[in-house]
């Protein structure tokens, strides 16, 4: 007997087409079962089909979805989840045209977050991150990548990673941990970036032993770390058994996309300034292009990543929030879907695949997340919508009714979130 049977699903978005990364026409294809049903037993999906095919199945609990839509839990493959403080005091300065470097000199910018993160205890960081995870869950997200990077020293980076490990045990959302110690060059290492990167590399063996990070990331950009420094750093991390990511070409066409494809990174993220050559190399690789249009929007920039061109040329595109306190303070991945549709010229079908299938592959979870398939974890979302296009079309609000994580209800609209975490 099943534990739970969901019936009368108007559109069941299984996302279950070919295995592997979705490209070109596959990105524009959504497998949908009309009048669908899903069976769950011991936290695992055991039946996927039509309501007619589900007749005769017995379950302890039968849930009538009222003709509404059900999808897999969404996957957010790029966040800066664990941090101290906030930066709303900088908004007025930005609107006045105060340059970012001047804000930095006043102790703001990333330095403000670094200082607040250093001062916070691990438990304070955990409680704050729980608040944000609760919000992500309410937007339908069940798997999240979480980066460190607001320490720029060993003690605080460890604290962030340990906080992420604790959150993995205490919150329903599955977390994938990324070490981003190479987020910026600290003042004390100005002009000595290679020495700083070596210091970060020296932390990796113990990090691997304690299983505190699965990925290593670096910010490859003008004035931060060069392409050659980034490649050398990430290749050494790969030698130590880590998978790698790269913040690439966010501002300038520096060659980060090319580097990511060349070294076999799991993903290249941002890519606003990616060159034609970089896009071509990504299309011929298994590196996912994780686009972060919410960041471009919040920074009030004119030029967005060329998502339409990337998809047309065969790049596997994913979407993420880039949730962070400075350049994209939102947990709302549904808003990101809307921005991607409007500014990256992605279709609703492409947007859905970019927050499920391809986003799961961007964090090496393609075999466990992003699809509704027999044998997979029952990470499901019931939407207050009757078709998939409505979600990115009606922007700025959450359309989520109920979220199941491993077969258990983790969020229901109108009821208190699972935790009592406060910001």
Curated annotation (Swiss-Prot):
CDD domains membership: Imidazolone-5PH
Alphabetically ordered keywords of this record: Cytoplasm, Histidine metabolism, Hydrolase, Iron, Metal-binding, Zinc
Entry's EC annotation: 3.5.2.7
Biological processes annotated in GO: L-histidine catabolic process to glutamate and formamide; L-histidine catabolic process to glutamate and formate
Pathway: Amino-acid degradation; L-histidine degradation into L-glutamate; N-formimidoyl-L-glutamate from L-histidine: step 3/3
Cofactor annotation remark: Binds 1 zinc or iron ion per subunit.
Pfam assignment, any one: Amidohydro_1
Matches recorded under SUPFAM superfamilies: Composite domain of metallo-dependent hydrolases, Metallo-dependent hydrolases
Keyword Zinc part of the UniProt annotation: yes
Entry's transmembrane regions: none
Coiled coil: none
Known catalytic reactions: 4-imidazolone-5-propanoate + H2O = N-formimidoyl-L-glutamate
Gene Ontology molecular function terms on file: imidazolonepropionase activity; iron ion binding; zinc ion binding
Its biological purpose: Catalyzes the hydrolytic cleavage of the carbon-nitrogen bond in imidazolone-5-propanoate to yield N-formimidoyl-L-glutamate. It is the third step in the universal histidine degradation pathway.
Protein name: Imidazolonepropionase
Organism: Bacillus anthracis
């Amino acid at each position: 007997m099943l534990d739970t049977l969901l019936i009368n699903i108007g559109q069941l978005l299984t996302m279950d087409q070919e295995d592997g990364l979705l490209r070109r026409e596959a990105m524009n294809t959504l497998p949908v079962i009309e009048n669908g049903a899903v069976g769950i037993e011991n936290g695992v999906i055991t039946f996927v089909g039509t309501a007619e095919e589900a007749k005769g199945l017995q379950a302890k609990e039968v849930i009538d979805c009222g003709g509404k839509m059900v999808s897999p839990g969404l996957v957010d493959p790029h966040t800066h989840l664990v941090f101290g403080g906030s930066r709303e005091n900088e908004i007025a300065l930005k609107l006045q045209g105060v340059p970012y470097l001047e804000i930095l000199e006043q102790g703001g910018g990333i330095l403000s977050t670094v200082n607040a993160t250093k001062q916070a205890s691990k438990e304070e960081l955990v409680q704050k991150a729980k608040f944000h995870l609760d919000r992500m869950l309410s937007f339908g997200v069940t798997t999240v990548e979480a980066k460190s990077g607001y320490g720029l020293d060993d003690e605080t980076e460890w604290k962030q990673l340990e906080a992420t490990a604790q959150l993995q045990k205490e919150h329903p959302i599955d977390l994938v941990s990324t070490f981003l110690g190479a987020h910026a060059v600290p003042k004390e290492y100005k002009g000595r970036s290679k020495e700083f990167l070596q210091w970060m590399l020296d932390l990796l063996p113990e990090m691997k032993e304690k299983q505190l990070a699965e990925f290593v990331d670096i910010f490859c950009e003008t004035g931060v770390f060069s392409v050659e420094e980034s490649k050398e750093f990430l290749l050494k991390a790969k030698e130590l058994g880590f998978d790698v990511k790269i913040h690439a070409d966010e501002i300038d066409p520096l060659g980060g996309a090319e580097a990511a494809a060349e070294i076999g990174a799991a993903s290249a993220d941002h890519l606003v300034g990616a060159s034609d050559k970089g896009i071509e190399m990504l299309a011929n690789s298994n590196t996912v292009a994780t686009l972060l249009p919410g960041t471009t929007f919040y920074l009030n920039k004119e030029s967005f990543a060329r998502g339409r061109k990337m998809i047309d040329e065969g790049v596997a595109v994913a979407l993420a929030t880039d949730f962070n306190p400075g350049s994209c303070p939102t947990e709302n991945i549904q808003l990101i879907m809307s921005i991607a549709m409007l500014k990256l010229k992605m279709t609703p079908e492409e947007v859905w695949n970019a927050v499920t299938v391809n986003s799961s592959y961007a964090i090496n979870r393609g075999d466990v997340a992003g699809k509704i398939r027999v044998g997979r974890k029952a990470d499901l979302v019931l939407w207050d919508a009757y078709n998939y296009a409505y979600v990115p079309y009606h922007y700025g609000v959450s359309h989520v009714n109920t979220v199941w994580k491993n077969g258990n209800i983790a969020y229901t609209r109108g009821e208190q979130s699972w935790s009592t975490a406060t910001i």
